[in-house]
Amino acid sequence: MNLASDKLEQLRTLLGGYGSCLVAYSGGVDSVFLARVAHEVLGDRTLAAIADSPSLPRRELQEALEIAARFGFPVRILQTREFANENYTANPANRCYFCKHELFEDLRPLARAEKFAVIAYGENASDTGDFRPGALAAAEFQVRAPLKEVGLTKAEIRELSAQLGLPTADKPQMACLSSRVPYGETVTPAKLRMIEQAEYVLRDLGFRDVRVRHHEMRSPEFGVRNENVAANSTLRTPHSALPLARIELAPVEIPLLLANGKLATVAEELKKIGYAHVTLDLQGYRRGSTNEGLSVASGNPA
């Protein structure tokens, strides 16, 4: 057996020792793999719980539910309330801590009520190099990270996911929509809807590694009505900030945006969504670009 296969057997043994397990599920590479293996080992003694809030794209939620149905593991949707927490919406560099704290705070009573011995989430061995406030919340709630505990890296999880036939094996890295808003700028459901719609425009044109970073340009002192913002946008008011979209694509995909009129199409569609300005980041997509300028990385590079 190769090293990844050895670790998979260690994971199965570890999960079996739990007896029962509640998995924090998102539909991403790591949590799909964890939920699939946990169900293989524990059967009906496991449950995947997905947190639904404005920070989760609707397509991601639907895809996560479809994967669970396809592979036969049970899933529960939890409506989380992080947007009621001013510590979260203020969008500090440790925003992920407050998100994960809310999630684990909701998972704990569910685990107790349905007698799951362990709560687990999908942190892996490749995550150890970052400052990860979410991991601090996990430690506070005694949430286990079995992928990390057996030393599985992201590359190995992708390899094993392919062997198990999971459609997420080559899924691009994902992160919550709130990660598109620069630290210190308030996170709101309205902003996240704009980001979500803008990224759909690009994904529907065939782009895979996509981030639309949401910035706000301040109007002059006495305010300027933004005539470019769609009439039905909540941002179309005098004295408001002017929303700017900074598009990040994989460097190899940037030439595709410049071809066949796609650049004009994207600009037009994003202005319909409500962006006053649409820009392209010439450095391309890179994880954690919102962290640039910070002394430490954030907890969820996106």
Region locations from a protein language model:
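Generic alpha-helical secondary structure
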Residues: 8, 104, 191-195, 259, ...
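A conserved acidic, glycine/proline-rich C-terminal tail/linker
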Residues: 255-270
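C-terminal boundary motif of the adenylate-forming
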Residues: 208-218, 281-283
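Short, low-order "capping/linker" segments at domain edges
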Residues: 288-302
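Residues at alpha-helix caps and immediate loop-helix transition turns in enzyme cores, especially N-
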Residues: 60-61, 173, 258-262
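A short interface-forming secondary-structure element
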Residues: 242, 246-259
